[in-house]
Design a protein with these regions (language model features):
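Single conserved hydrophobic/aromatic residue that forms the stacking wall/gate
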Residues: 1-12
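Short metal-coordination and nucleic-acid-contact micro-motifs, chiefly zinc-binding Cys/His arrays
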Residues: 45-49, 84-87
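Acidic/histidine-rich catalytic cores and adjacent linkers
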Residues: 49, 54, 60, 147, ...
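Short, positively charged, Gly/Tyr-enriched micro-motifs
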Residues: 56, 69-163, 167-174, 211-214, ...
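Glycine-rich phosphate-binding "P-loop"
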Residues: 103-110, 181-195
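Short alpha-helix plus adjacent loop in nuclease-associated cores
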Residues: 245-266
Length: 427
């Protein structure tokens, strides 16, 4: 079904020009057609014949080209396209033909500049390329071509004094490496793999003098990074992420609780209570609520502290490991490195092998953990960046091409902060 608008060309042509933000005075609007799925704006491009670019003679108006179908931004919530008839000119001296040109679209192009600008704007957001194409009524290939217009030029003459290292999943079973400037959150590099060879080859492209400027590197408890970081950045201190240190202790406590819980009969009260209230054992004891509620498992009103006392009364082993765990948390959160490691050394032979494993790891990485307690740096900012990367990946239902994925990361995370690092191709 097609409906045509009744309008005065003198008034509406001017209004439509303002509405569409078209500044070319040589475009004249003729009609608007409202179709079921979109709007079509009929227009023509015409102006006085120019001189011939070949011989310099005066050209003459010849005819109009077949209408170009130019996609445009939505109007009144409907996809819109302009059917633009362009004047052709002919030189009767050398037979040169030329088509009229307009500022709204490049020569020999069909996608207008305003749509290209909108694509670039949406690429900065976390929208998938398929959704961008659907929203702007263009092909996905057009969006990918615009993505490829962005060029990231790594600056091998500079590295920040403080940077963060981490990894993220690019495809199933394959981890990639990412490094970020701790202060301004700009991405330094994204590498397809996280092997020592890949990371070493990348950072060796920086001069040693540049690498010696790095003072701090924050990272997870991933041992292959330790020696590599010291080789590449001889002046850098390694700071382990505090969250992952606490996570190691928490997991050891959780596994210990499960082992003790499984010693009880599955239908016993002890088993059910230990399983149901597992969070109270994991929680920092200083944050336990003192509000009293009716607890169906115990058939009485109890506070969280009273429930915890009952759980710990079921097993001396559980009580001992819980007390060690809580003391470790206390010293760690108060940044008391000497007391933290003193407690580990005093108890390493008295605890379950589950705790012994993490205690040995902590003692081996003592210097890096002390740095984490003494210095105000962590991997929290990079973990937040990784969440944004996961969002980009999830919205796109995954990426097959690593370079496209890498560009989306740089565009989304760097371009708002430092546009000088990007060159938008004008070709």
């Amino acid at each position: 079904e097609i409906s045509r608008s009744d309008w005065s060309s003198d008034v509406c042509s001017s209004d439509l020009t303002k509405l569409l933000d078209i500044k070319d005075p040589n475009i004249q609007f003729i009609d608007i057609i409202n179709r079921d799925t979109h709007k079509e704006i009929i227009a023509k491009l015409d102006y006085n014949a120019p001189s011939c670019p070949e011989c310099g003679s005066q050209m003459k108006k010849y005819d109009f080209q077949k209408p170009s179908k130019i996609p445009y931004l939505e109007t009144t919530g409907m996809p819109t396209r302009i059917l633009l008839k362009k004047r052709r000119f002919k030189c009767y001296h050398c037979s040169k033909m030329m088509v009229a040109e307009t500022s709204i679209v490049k020569k020999n192009h069909q996608i207008p500049r305003i749509i290209n600008q909108k694509i670039a704007q949406k690429l900065i957001e976390k929208t998938s390329m398929t959704d961008i194409a659907h929203q702007l009524a263009i092909s996905t290939s057009t969006v990918i071509r615009k993505l490829n217009d962005f060029r990231f030029k790594p600056d091998f003459s500079y590295l920040p004094e403080i940077m963060s290292w981490d990894e993220y999943a690019f495809t199933k079973g394959k981890m990639s490496f990412i490094a970020q400037n701790f202060d301004n959150l700009n991405i330094i590099t994204v590498l397809e793999g996280r092997t020592q060879a890949i990371i070493r080859n990348h950072f060796l492209r920086y001069d040693r003098a540049v690498r010696c400027q790095v003072k701090i590197i924050t990272m997870d408890m991933f041992s292959p990074y330790y020696d590599l970081a010291k080789q590449l950045f001889p002046n850098a201190k390694i700071v382990l992420d505090r969250f992952h240190i606490v996570q190691h202790m928490s997991r050891a406590m959780s596994r210990m609780r499960v082992q003790i819980m499984n010693q009880f009969h599955r239908k016993s009260h002890e088993y059910k209570a230990t399983k149901r209230y597992w969070k109270l054992i994991q929680q920092d004891s200083r944050k336990l609520s003192d509000k009293r509620f009716y607890r169906p498992t115990f058939r009485m009103h109890l506070t969280n502290k009273e429930i915890l006392d009952k759980l710990l009364s079921y097993s001396e082993d559980l009580k001992h490991h819980y007390n060690v765990y809580q003391l470790l948390l206390f010293h760690f959160q108060n940044k008391e490195a000497d007391k933290f490691f003193g407690l580990i050394e005093d108890n390493i032979k008295l605890v379950h092998p589950l705790f012994q494993t993490i205690f040995k790891t902590f003692l081996k990485d003592k210097e890096k953990i002390v740095n984490a307690l003494q210095l105000p740096y962590s991997n929290a900012k990079l973990e937040a960046t990784n969440n944004l990367i996961k969002l980009i990946k999830r919205n796109a239902f995954g990426f097959r091409n690593f370079e496209n994925f890498k560009k989306r990361i740089f565009i989304a995370l760097n371009i708002k902060k430092e546009r000088t690092n990007f060159v938008l191709s004008r070709s």
